Amino acid sequence: VNAESGFEIKPVYRPGDVSPDASIGEPGEFPYTRGVYPTMYTKRPWTMRQYAGFGTAAESNARYHQLLAAGTMGLSVAFDLPTQMGYDSDEPIAHGEVGKVGVAIDSIDDMRRLFHEIPLDKVSTSMTINAPGSVLLLLYQLVAEEQGVPGTALQGTIQNDILKEYIARGTYIFPPKPSLRLVADTFAYCRKEIPKWNTISISGYHMAEAGASPAQEIAFTLANGMEYVRAALAAGLAVDDFAPRLSFFFVARTTLLEEIAKFRAARRMWARVMRDEFGAQDPKSLMLRFHTQTAGVQLTAQQPEVNLVRVAIQALGAVAGGTQSLHTNAYDEAIALPTEKSARLALRTQQVLAFESGLTGTVDPFAGSYAIEALTDEVEKEATALIERVFSYGSAVDAIEQGFQKQEIETSAYRIANEIDSGERVVVGVNRFAAETEERYEPLRVDPAIEAAQVARLAALRADRDSVAVETALADLAKAAGGNENVLPLMKEALRLRATVGEVCHTLRGVWGVYHPVERF
């Protein structure tokens, strides 16, 4: 049997299969193979952070209140595609996409509605937003200030990982160089203004969903992480001033053993890179802390209830692998946005693992398993070789511009598709054990009238604000973007005056330009 990462999985593992110098160590100690904290889940479970957002800010706010009442421990905001791409809801390119795959946020007014009656000093919030990540973070900070909550009390994460957008996802705006400058500006701003905030979630999840193997997922993610560290150092930041706030985001597939090994390998690889290559001294700079989401790409529209089983196995792998927070997908997400019932069942899956399985009673319970330790070594070996190939191009950005990571992922995705089509890779309910008839399922649908209502609110905002003050603030932002000063303070002032997400992003487009990928065959 071959692992997803390409190496052979043996039918039996013995003591001789484990490297005698395997860096297993102790939990909470370098190189953190067994976990970043000594006690891990024995004192408190991982953060159960369910990703949600659709339609209007008011509708998403209602869903957040439902999730908090059901026991979720942190919020995770999904934004619609126009917001992710830095467009306002009334722009022609946004037509038909407003509120579809996440919530539409155009201005501080929408952000205020999104977190209505949610005390921002009492909840940790993750925002899946990249190219305009700094814009949404500043809107969040402004709403917190209206609540009387200082930036020093805010806790959460913005994804803010633009490099993986060039590789796998595509919601980029600006070219790599100014994008990395914006990331570094965010690091510097948050160090002073929002010190408990995780300023980036360096993401392998999207690459995995595009077809990357476990080894490719962690290799390309860690290579991107190294690029961000270099950008911050080049901007004059000291490594231990920002590295403790770096975080990561990985997938959890149903291939349980390899996934556990992947998480363990990633932790020790990052610890060594930060210590040996970047000279980090603070132990927190060496710790790879990560969020996990179960693999949406493995969910099926056929017999969707079977996805409950898939998600439970995936979640088990994430927890056994030492994740800091977890989102479990709803069983109906291969069809549409989750319903209230399916979202509740997804959360209950985590709660059963945390409170009924006994898994939280022992740190890294798979440690010492011949199979797990050997697989951890193998995944690390494969991923290390891939990182070397990335940097043979000069940098991660150079490799991206040559299409290396994208081509590697596409080759892997093609192999997986062929294996499913041929039946070599079994997908229960799809190419084996299919049902003769499928039960009718009624998915959650987003009301098309939402777009018209959002556009009307945006028109009212433009009519009500001080347009001269907004234009002046945007001009100041453009001047800063063309120079060397940190753009976030000026961006915040424009947003406070009710400039829109689209207006801020268009201002930066005018200075930095937009990215046009080079197609390679």
Segments predicted by a language model, with ranges:
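Flexible, glycine-rich loop/tail regions that form catalytic "lids" or insertion modules at the edges
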Residues: 1-20, 30-32, 81, 339-340, ...
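Catalytic alpha/beta active-site cores
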Residues: 1-253, 258-259, 277, 284-291, ...
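Conserved active-site and cofactor/substrate-binding residues in soluble primary-metabolism enzymes
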Residues: 27, 58-62, 70, 105-109, ...
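Generic secondary-structure signature for well-ordered alpha-helical cores
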Residues: 73, 116-120, 145-150, 184-196, ...
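A short glycine/serine-rich beta->alpha loop
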Residues: 123-129, 211-212, 255, 297-303, ...
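Catalytic or ion-translocation cores adjacent to nucleophile or general acid/base/metal-coordination motifs
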Residues: 151, 182, 337, 518-521
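Active-site capping/gating regions of soluble enzymes
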Residues: 203, 219-228, 235, 244-429
